[in-house]
Amino acid sequence: MMLLAAAEARQLPVLAICFGIQSLNVYRGGTLIQDVETEVKDSLKHMQGDLFWRRSHSINITEDSLIAKLAESTHTTVNSHHHQAIDIVGRDLEPIAWAPDGVIEAVVNTRADQFILGVQWHPEVGWQNDLLSQAIFNHFITVARERSSAGVAATASADR
């Protein structure tokens, strides 16, 4: 939570993965489903064990959202390795992707002052062969570079 607070105070870009999206949601005042398998009616198997690197379920993505643009689609499949998930969405977060059982799979920050993308799956696993994972990381790196350049320019101006 301290890292999220520090990133927010400095308006640093955040890419929150798996436990990260859950932590982000709680930090923003939201709540979690504690056990998807027992608390979500007709839940998919979100905890894949040793096979978590394999794509295990589809997600539906909000049209024109960041993930839809990066995926170039409103549907894709993702890996899955979690038993908790977002329940009540935290302030200034907007869900943009869901599993077929209704579990939230991605959120974005609705405030323009800070880039935040949270995903419930693991784009860092198997990214070498996954175009969406590559697009997520490339976009995050671009945003971070732009933020860094803007921060350097602002610091240089303040030093004059």
Segments (PLM) and residue ranges:
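Class I SAM-dependent methyltransferase SAM-binding "motif I" and its flanking Rossmann-like core
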Residues: 34
